[in-house]
Every structure is written in structure tokens, then in C-alpha cells.
Curated annotation (Swiss-Prot):
This is Imidazole glycerol phosphate synthase subunit HisF. The gene is hisF. Heterodimer of HisH and HisF. Its EC number is 4.3.2.10. The keyword Transmembrane helix does not apply.
Length: 252
């Protein structure tokens, strides 16, 4: 088993980190750059920043936040939200981000995945897939979970891999923010359908849930927000738990 990555997720709105349940009822969790520094010290393997209103409100990411974060942390970080063009990607990567995450724009213009991979390399391109269960399958949503696409999540995952995505960030909207555990059935279905790494997102409430995502869901990395922001568990506590259950993690 390859080393598994633990990734705190920072949902950003109006320059602040927020968290809600099922993509609603957002509450303030702090300054993104300060939180990034904190998680770097805590032993996080990577960070993901998602500007959760950028796509819906048709506005680009604040480059200033990217530059400040790049100057403050030593771990890789991904930026998503409002990225619609190759020039958007270039601006964010040039400002210091290691990867860009695209979601709504990838569905509307799948060629953006292929072009981004060609220009910057697949390792820089993460495709985020937000989905809900429907009639025994999973349906893809865009625009921050507000717009249903009719796409099947597993088929879409295979398509983004074919187009050149380097990773998939897979969020169960049903589980998001509930702290009841990841949708391991969804994770396993997508992980077995593609060769590229799948990052589990949505539902972490305790270290056991991250273990389930890795073992049952076959995830390559696990992303969590509430349990870390609220200091229910620290990154190091989660890593110690996973290591104690035979899962390889980076311990400093």
C-alpha cells in the first residue's frame, strides 16, 4: 500500500474559511493563510483551497491569497473555484499553487482538462466531482452543488482520466459536513473504475472514517475539514490512529 495523504480542506468565501452541512449554513472558521500555516506545522501532507462561491458568482480566485500561502507553507497546495480558462490556471500556478482543481468548467468544457494537462502536465490538474445518490447511481452536480448535470459520476470519472486529469477529488454531497463517514461505496466504485488517484471528500467525523475511506473506499488520499477546523482531532492524531491500524502515512 502506498503512503496515504491527509489533506485539510479550506472552503473559502469572501476571503475567509467557512464550513457548512450539505453545502449550506456556512459558518466562519478563520483566515485561510493562518490556517494553512497551522496545518503545515501540524503535519498535513497537502492542502486544498476551494473558493466555494467563485464558480457560481462568476468571479476569479484571489491571487493575493495564493501568493501569501505559497510564501508561508512548504507543502503542496491545490486551488479550486472559478477556474475557467488556461490563463486562469497559469495565473494561479504562477502565483505559487502546485495544482488547480476544476469542476463546473470541466463539465461545461471537457477540452479544458486536456488542454490544461498538455500545457502544465497532468500532475497539476485535479478534477473535482461533486455527486449525489440517485436511483442506485451517483449523479454529478456543478456550480457549488446547485446545478444537476445528468452525468453519471463513474462514467464522468473515467472520462476525465481519459482526458488527462492527474487526480480526482470526489465529494459525496449526501455525506458532506454530516460527520457520519464518507460514502465508501461511491469511493470504491470510482477508485476501481480509474487508475489515477482518488481523493475522498465529504463526511469525516472521526479517524475511523478516514480509515474506512482508505480501506473500504480504496481512496489514495483523504480530505477533511470540520474535524480539523474545530480541533476535534489534529492531523497528527489522525495519522497516529491510521499508522496504528497498519495504514502507511508520513509521520514527522
Amino acid at each position: 500500500m502506498l503512503t496515504k495523504r491527509i489533506i485539510p480542506c479550506l472552503d473559502v468565501k469572501g476571503g475567509r474559511v467557512v464550513k457548512g452541512v450539505n453545502f449550506k449554513d456556512l459558518r466562519d472558521e478563520g483566515d485561510p493563510v493562518e490556517l494553512a500555516r497551522y496545518y503545515d506545522r501540524e503535519g498535513a501532507d497537502e492542502l486544498v483551497f476551494l473558493d466555494i462561491t467563485a464558480s457560481a458568482e462568476n468571479r476569479g480566485i484571489v491571487i493575493d491569497m495564493v501568493e501569501k500561502t505559497a510564501a508561508s507553507v512548504f507543502i503542496p497546495f491545490t486551488i479550486g473555484g472559478g477556474i475557467r480558462t488556461i490563463s486562469d490556471m497559469k495565473a494561479i500556478l504562477n502565483a505559487g499553487a502546485d495544482k488547480v482543481s476544476i469542476n463546473s468548467a470541466a463539465v461545461k468544457n471537457p477540452g479544458l482538462i486536456a488542454e490544461g494537462a498538455r500545457v502544465f502536465g497532468s500532475q497539476c490538474i485535479v478534477v473535482a466531482i461533486d455527486c449525489c445518490r440517485k436511483n442506485g447511481n451517483w449523479e454529478v452536480y456543478i456550480n457549488g452543488g446547485r446545478t444537476v448535470t445528468g452525468l453519471d459520476a463513474i462514467k464522468w470519472a473515467q472520462k476525465v482520466e481519459e482526458l488527462g486529469a492527474g487526480e480526482i477529488l470526489l465529494t459525496s454531497m449526501d455525506a458532506d459536513g454530516t460527520k457520519d463517514g464518507y460514502d465508501t461505496e461511491l469511493l470504491a466504485a470510482v477508485s476501481t473504475a480509474v487508475e489515477i488517484p482518488v481523493i475522498a471528500s465529504g463526511g469525516a467525523g472521526m479517524p475511523e472514517h478516514l480509515r474506512e475511506a482508505i480501506v473500504e473506499g480504496q481512496a489514495d488520499a483523504v480530505l477533511a475539514a470540520s474535524i480539523f477546523h474545530e480541533k476535534t482531532y489534529s492531523v497528527s492524531e489522525v495519522k497516529e490512529y491510521l499508522a496504528g491500524h497498519g495504514i502507511p502515512v508520513r509521520i514527522e
